A protein has these predicted regions:
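Helix-capping/helix-break motifs at membrane-protein junctions
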Residues: 167-168
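Structural signature of beta-strand start/N-cap positions in the alpha/beta core
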Residues: 72, 97, 153-155
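A short glycine-rich, Lys/Arg-flanked "PGG" loop and its adjoining helix->strand segment in the class I
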Residues: 172-184
Length: 279
């Protein structure tokens, strides 16, 4: 078993504007039965309550990632809208925007048919990226992914439970694409199982190293069902992609007290404040 020591220059400061109003919004999102919700049998991403997890991450985006209502969001691995649905209640309908991509057609169709008609600045597209679990017949290798947006198109890129299903060589490509797509001051919000060889003895997952590389896996039958990555490799590749790492925060999968389950990387595109609000 392995775990990560805290590797961060300093904790990311909480957004001072994220006060009682945000608490009210997050509670409302969990209890509002009129919010879009996919049929139970069609939810193919993760476990747990769809609304509660979406609301939780909206809180993380704002408090930790410093997401603002006017910003342009890119959701890599948007699934069936678990992050998009709560964002409809936060992003400014005239200045903010959201684009999500995923290889699973069912999720994209549900989002495009359910969310976009009511929120036209929320857009979804399927990319036929090959993945042994989610899209085994995909035509595009993960090492050749290039998202169809111009440089600096976004202020906030999220990869929630994406790195946990990628081999190291594909993760490097995604980091490079995130850096390309972020405008100056933009943030990457990425969750991962980041490992450095230490252990708390309380981890909920036990990882084994994949051959001699920086990748790890927890499930023998399906290595990419829960993939880990060397923390040093993750930090180095994020920097090589052109981003400045602000923090790598350990998650409570390790058996420790934390606000989030997976480890959380926050990295920033150098160059000042983002230039959101144009889409």
């Amino acid at each position: 078993m392995t775990a990560l020591r805290q590797i961060a220059p300093e904790p990311v400061p909480a957004d001072a504007s994220a006060g009682p109003e945000l608490d009210w919004l997050l509670a409302a999102l969990q209890s509002n039965r009129f919010m879009p919700h996919p049929p139970e049998g069609s939810i193919f991403v993760g476990d747990g309550d769809y609304r509660a997890i979406g609301a939780e991450f909206l809180g993380h985006f704002i408090r930790i990632g410093r997401l603002k209502p006017h910003e342009r969001v890119f959701d890599i691995g948007c699934g069936i809208g678990r992050m998009a649905v709560p964002l409809t209640q936060y992003l400014d309908p005239e200045r903010g925007s959201y684009d999500g991509v995923d290889p699973v057609m069912e999720g994209i169709l549900w989002c495009a048919q359910t969310i976009t008609p009511a929120y036209p600045r929320f857009r979804f597209q399927r990319l036929d990226i090959a993945h042994p679990l989610y899209n085994p017949q995909g035509s595009l290798p993960g090492t050749e992914v290039r998202f169809g947006f111009a440089n600096s198109s976004f202020d906030f890129v999220t990869m929630t439970s994406v790195a946990t299903h990628l081999p190291p060589d594909e993760l490097v490509v995604y980091l490079q694409e995130a850096a390309r797509l972020l405008g100056p001051g933009g943030r990457l919000f990425l969750t991962a199982f980041a490992l450095d060889g230490t252990s708390t003895g309380q981890e909920r997952l036990s990882f084994k190293r994949w051959q001699d590389g920086p990748g790890w896996y927890a499930i023998d039958e399906a290595p990419l069902a829960a993939a880990g990555i060397d923390s040093r490799f993750l930090l180095e590749q994020t920097a090589l992609a052109g981003l400045t790492v602000e923090a790598l925060r350990p998650g409570h999968w390790r058996g420790i007290s934390a606000a989030h389950y997976q480890d959380l990387l926050i990295a920033t595109k150098p160059g000042g404040k983002g230039v959101g609000g144009t889409a």
